[in-house]
Amino acid sequence: MNAVSQPVAHTAAGAVRGEVDPRTGVRTWRGVPFGASTAITGRFRAPQPVDPWKGELDATRFGAPAMQGTFGLRGTVLGSEDCLNLDIVRPDTDDVLPVVVCLHGGTFVTGASHDKVLQGHHLTKATDIVYVSVNFRLGVLGYLDVRSLGDDCVANPAIHDQILALTWIKDNIAAFGGDPDQVTIMGESAGGAAVMHLMCAPGARGLFHRAIAQSPPPASVHSRIQATMWVRALTGRVGLPPNPTLDDLRAMPAEDLVRAGQSMMINSKELLQFNTSFMPTIDSATLAEHPIDTFNQGKQAPVPMIVGTNSDEASFTKALYQTAGQRLRAARRALDVFDPDNAGDVIEAYGDVGQRRDFAALMGDAVFWAPTVIVATAHRMVAPTYMYRFAYASAAMRMLGLGAMHAADLVAVYGDPYATKAAKFDRFGSKETFEKVSELMQHHWGTFFHTGAPGQDWPVYGFRHDGQPGRATAVFDTGMHVEHDPKAEHRYAWESFDMREWGANRVDFWD
C-alpha cells in the first residue's frame, strides 16, 4: 500500500487501486472480485476463483450485488450473476489491524455489501479494523437446492461463495494491512444465520477466529425434501415441462427465475418467513445436519462468539392482523408446522396472544430469541459465549409502537445515524442518548474484534455456580447493564419445543 489519495494493494490476482474517502478519511477499495462470474454455466455450481488481470483494477466503484427482486409492482430485478466481489475499508494508516468480515442480511433474498448502513466507515474508524463486506448469491440462485434436477450442482451456492470469500481474505488481506490470523465474521438477521452456518461448515474451519451473530434465525434451514418441493414450485411457475433438467434452468434468463422466486415467496402464505422458499439446505458438504443439532453436539467451530437479539424484533407484526382471533390463529399455525404437540404450552406462556403486544413478543421470540438461546447454551460448552439484548428505542420509536425493532441495532453498532430512514427516529429528541449507546456498543464490539472478549464488564453466558445465577446477558438500553437469565419463564416454555423440523405433512401451498 502507499499513503496517497489512490492507495494500491497487490492481490494474488492483480493490483487494485482504491481511494481515500473525502468524507470520512478512510481508505476504500470497492467491488474487488474474489470469484468468477456465476452466470450460465456457473449457475447453481460451486464458485471458482477470479481469473488474474493485468495492470491496476479500478476499485473506486461498488461492484454489482447479487441478482434480487425489489418486491415492487413492476417486477424490477437488480444486480448481476457476476456478483462475487467485496468492499474493503480501513483507516488511513499502515498499521496491521484485525479483520472484520460482514455478511449482509435480507431474508436470504435481498441485500448488498454496500447497503448504506453496512458500509463500515464509522465502525472502522471507531474500532481500528480492516472491514470487509461481501456480496454472494441470493434467493433462487444462492439459496435453493436444485439437486433434485441433477447432480451437476451444489446445494448451497451462497455458503460456497462465502467460504471462497473467506479463503480470498485469508490469502490476500495482508496486502490491505489486515491480519489474516485475526478474522471476525459478523452479520445481522440472515447475515447472522450465515455466521452460524459458517461455524457449522467444515470448509470454513480455520478461516475465521471470532464470530458475532446479531438477531440470527438459527432454525431457518430446509431439509432436502422441503427444497425439492420448492424446486417443483419454481419449475411450475416458470412454465417448464414435466421432468425439467438443470440445463433447462440454466438456459432461462436469470431475471425470470428471480421474478418467479419472488412470486413464490409472496404466495407461500408463511407468516414472517418462518420457512421461506429460500434458505440453506441440510446437505453433506456445508451443513451436514441441522445447525441446532451441530451446536448441541459441539461440532461447530470453537471460536468466541457474541450473539443476541433485540427486545422488539417482531413489533411490525402488530399491524398485520386486525382481530384477536386472526392473531391467535396465526400464532397457532406458525408454531404447529414445527411442533404441534408443544405449541399450545408455548403460546400459553405469552399470556393473551390475541393482543398485539403479546402476539409480537411470541413471533419475535419464535424466530430469533428462542433458537438463539439454544445455540448460546450449547456454544458455551466449547468456547466463550457472550449474550446481549438490544433494548434501546427513542421516544419516537416507542410512541409508534415499534420499540427496539428488528435491525434497529445496526445503526448503533455501525455508528451512522443517517444510514437508514428509521434512524431518523433514533435521532429525534434523543441524539445524545443514541450516541452514548452507539459508543458503548462500538467499544464492546471493538474490544471483541481485537481480543476475542467484549470487556470485563460483560461476563460470559455461563452456568449457575457458587451462588452466581448464570446466563449473564448484556442489556443495551440508555446505557449498558447485565441481567441474568432474562425472560426465564419464556425460556422454560421453549425448552420442550422442537423447532428443527418443519411442515412434514404440509401440502396446502404446493398447489
Residue positions per predicted region:
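Non-catalytic accessory segments of hydrolases
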Residues: M1-N156, A423-M441, F449-D457, M480, ...
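Short Gly/aromatic-enriched secondary-structure transition segments
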Residues: T24, T28-D51, A319-F338, V460-G470
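A structural signal for well-ordered alpha-helical segments within the folded catalytic domains
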Residues: R27, E81-L84, H160-I163, T167, ...
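Short, solvent-exposed turn/loop segments enriched in Gly/Ser/Thr/Pro and often Arg
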Residues: R137-G139, M186-A190, R389-S394, V460-Q468
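Substrate-gating cap/lid region and adjacent catalytic-acid/histidine neighborhood
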Residues: R210, D256-E432, H444, T451
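C-terminal domain-tail junction helix/linker
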Residues: F463-R491
